[in-house]
Regions:
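Pyridoxal 5′-phosphate
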Residues: 1-279
Length: 279
């Protein structure tokens, strides 16, 4: 179930501030836009991103990974390049890469896990090579419960010249995730794993990477100008957010992050440890 604060906040939006964002000149639209963009800022602060412009709202983490795979992957992956995953990945972090690999004629490789159910670092090292253009891994596995050594993995990847995408769905509500400290390049998160509503997620990447990525969806809001011959794109983050966004859901996610911050991640970890020891 969801925290009462989250439900109340969504209800308040629909009762008092219900309007589309970035489109209207009237007061309700201005209020909704402010609340929506404050939600983006709250995610930026939560993951310690460089700028709120780096936060792309999506329907879920699956869509976030698909945007990275299709927009960045199709543009940057060449024939015989490699994408390195682990065998513990969620299907959402496998299938998008398989699709782009088939289209761009590159390969998807999988690092093994040990008998203890953790990432086999030696196998990972063996499969990381000059053809590996991106490493995409889960932070905490939703099936095995293990926490991957992301800083060690990122260092290996960076030394190899590879980018790193982190599926942080399971970790964001349980441990601190600092994108700068982890030195990653992409992060995918989902609202419903953060005590927030369904139908909202986000993709983070550094501004210099996002600037070079083409938009995946076309329509309202993501354009700057539309001509008969061509169109030009809006600035970040809006060039990746076509159409009316999930406004209430974004505002609800922002309230959920406030709820987690009030509880404190250290207190959450302590309580989870006590539960584990009790079991």
């Amino acid at each position: 179930q969801k925290p009462k604060q989250v439900i109340k906040r969504i209800n308040d939006y629909y009762l008092n501030s219900n309007a589309n964002v970035h489109r209207g000149a009237h007061q309700l639209s201005a209020e909704a836009t402010e609340e929506f963009e404050n939600a983006r800022l709250s995610i930026k602060n939560y993951i310690k991103a460089y700028s709120e412009k780096e936060i792309i709202f999506t329907r879920n983490a699956t869509e976030a990974i698909n945007i990275a795979a299709k927009s960045w992957g199709e543009k940057n992956l060449q024939e015989n390049d490699e994408i390195l995953l682990s065998i513990m990945e969620h299907h959402s972090n496998i299938v998008p890469w398989q699709i782009v690999a088939e289209k761009n004629k590159c390969k998807v490789k999988f690092a093994k896990i040990t008998n203890d159910g953790i990432l086999d670092i030696e196998d990972f090292k063996n499969k990381l090579n000059q053809r590996t253009k991106i490493v995409s891994l889960v932070h905490i596995s939703n099936t095995l419960g293990c926490c991957n050594p992301i800083k060690e993995i990122t260092q290996l990847a960076k030394n190899n010249g590879s980018l790193v995408l982190l599926d942080a769905c399971q970790s964001l509500a349980h441990t601190e995730v600092d994108v700068k400290d982890l030195n990653i390049d992409f992060l995918a998160g989902s609202g419903h794993k953060l005590c927030g509503p369904t139908g909202i997620g986000f993709l983070w990447s550094r501004e210099e990477i996002l600037d070079k990525m083409p938009p995946l969806f076309g329509g309202g809001e993501m354009i700057q100008d539309v001509f008969e011959e061509k169109s030009t794109w809006a600035d970040l983050p809006h060039k990746f957010e076509a159409g009316t966004p999930a406004i209430a859901e974004a505002i609800g996610l922002s309230e959920a992050l406030k709820y987690i911050n009030r509880l404190g991640l250290n207190n959450i970890q302590k309580y989870e440890k006590e539960l584990t020891e009790y079991l």
